Amino acid sequence: MEATAAWIRLMRVQTRVLDAVEQELKKAGFPPLAWYDALLELSRAPSGELRPVELERQMLLPQYSTSRLIERLVDEGLAVRRECKIDKRGLFVEITEAGRELQKKMWNAYSAAIEKYVGSKLSDPDAVKLCGLLDRLGCSCSEAKPAAAARDGVPAR
């Protein structure tokens, strides 16, 4: 019974915090969080490019319409599609300089929202404890990047 109660709370908190973060981004005039997520993964990739299936697999948020998201990023000049030189049927999505700039600008609003809705409610020891509990459920906070990387627009996971 306690596991069910924990599950329900986990899902409710995740939904509420994501909704609040989305609203903060919207108020700041930015596109949805999925755009940030995709741009971040592209910026982290070698040469700034990934196959669409790799992008979908690496995104933090579930993205059921990755092809539509990629289309929007391309239309806005934040990414480009290019053919694989070896396999002409293969496609890559590559982040543009404009995409890198937007991802960094969005991080300012995103990180402020994380602080507002999570950081301000947890002490550092509480956050470490929460990461430990989530690790037991299969979410490894130990793979997180250092805080300095987060300040540069590349958040820890």
Language-model-detected regions and their locations in the chain:
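Short, hydrophobic-biased segments on the C-terminal half of alpha helices
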Residues: 52, 70-71
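N-terminal helix-turn-helix DNA-binding core of bacterial DNA-binding proteins
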Residues: 20-62, 147-151
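Alpha-helical linker/hinge and terminal dimerization helices associated
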Residues: 17, 21-24, 59, 102-121, ...
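N-terminal positioning helix adjacent to the helix-turn-helix/winged-helix DNA-binding module
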Residues: 6, 34-35, 98, 126
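Charged, amphipathic alpha-helical coiled-coil/dimerization segments
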Residues: 71-129
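C-terminal regulatory/oligomerization modules of transcriptional regulators
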Residues: 1, 124-157
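N-terminal leader segment of winged-helix/HTH proteins
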Residues: 1-29, 157
